[in-house]
Every structure is written in C-alpha cells, then in structure tokens.
Amino acid sequence: MKRLILASSSPRRIELLKQFGIEFEIIPSNIDESIDQSLSVEENVMQLAKKKAQEVFNKLREENKHFLVIAADTLVFVEGVILGKPSNEDEAFWMLRKISGKWHSVYTGVCIIDGPRERILVEYEKSNVYIKHMSDEEILRYISTKEPFDKAGAYAIQGFGSLIVERIDGCFYNVVGLPLYRLNIMLQKLGYDLMKGEL
C-alpha cells in the first residue's frame, strides 16, 4: 500500500479524508501563503497548492519515493478581490461585510504528487455561495465565536457559518476546503480510487 501524505494541518481536510477509512500521515507544509493580487484566483489557488505539495515532497524524497502527497489551498473571490484568511478581528469584520448579502465564489486548488513517477497534477474547483445580509451586530456576534480566523473569507460553512449561508451552487466540500469529487477524479487519472478504500 502506498504511503499517503496530507500536506495540511486543517482539521476540516483531515476529517474529510478520514471518512474513507484509508491510512494517511499529516505533514503540514510551511510555505508563505501570501496572495498575489496580480494573478487570477485560479492561478493563486493552484500555485499555492503546488507549492505546499512540492515542499512536503522535497522533505520526503530522500527517504523513498513510494508515497503520494495531497495538498490544497482555498480562497474566496468577491467583486474583483481575492480573500484569504483574516489575520485579526478588523480584517474578519471587513471580509464578512464584503460578502454579506451577495454571491461570492470559493476556489480550492488541489495538487497531487505521485512519488514513484514524480508526476504532478494540479486542478481547481469552484463553488458559488450566497451569504445572507448581516447587520454589523450579527457580524460581530459571529466573529465572537472565533470561527472566522483560520478560514478563507472569514467563515466556515460547516460550523456557525452554516447559519449565514443561504444558498450554494457547486461542491459543498469545496467550500469546506477539499473538493472530494475533484480529488478522486485526479486520483483516478493516476490509477488510484478512493472508492476502493486503499491507494
């Protein structure tokens, strides 16, 4: 069985992968996740996912190459602006006000590096989300849950944030942070399949 590495410490991504009953290791990447506003959001998520996977792959390549690295990066796009994770309450407030009462797009880039062949696949998934109109008081109440601070766009669709998401068009798991359908399509291109319960 191939050694599977998830290049992320995200609790959401870990839980999503765990549900398939496959064994995997968690080796978080340590890259600079700064957003390049001169690039498209698609280019940003794919570039960041690839950097994460490549960094972890390079750490392990001297041991042996019988492993598979999976990395992902999620960003939000609204009115021409790319949103990452807020670094403080003011930034979270600004982001939540920005997405309040309108549609925005969530993009997740996924990169898989197949160790034995050093084959690299990078793709992305897009979902559209409509956030209900929130008063400043509601925004502050949501921020007080502390949920926004490690989430792109300052909300979690599977937590308290589910109470502000009015509609979604596209893959739900993409908004959580790991588009499972897209991930499995990519794995199938490399000869693997999550449906089989092993890699």
Curated annotation (Swiss-Prot):
BP GO terms, sorted: nucleotide metabolic process
CDD domains reported in the protein's UniProt record: Maf
Residue numbers marked as site, Important for substrate specificity: 12, 74, 158
InterPro entries: ITPase-like_fam, Maf-like
Primary subcellular site in the record, as a coarse category: cytoplasm
Annotated compartments: Cytoplasm
One Gene Ontology cellular component annotation held by this UniProt entry: cytoplasm
Keyword Cytoplasm attached: yes
Protein's name in the database: dTTP/UTP pyrophosphatase
Species of provenance: Caldicellulosiruptor bescii (strain ATCC BAA-1888 / DSM 6725 / KCTC 15123 / Z-1320)
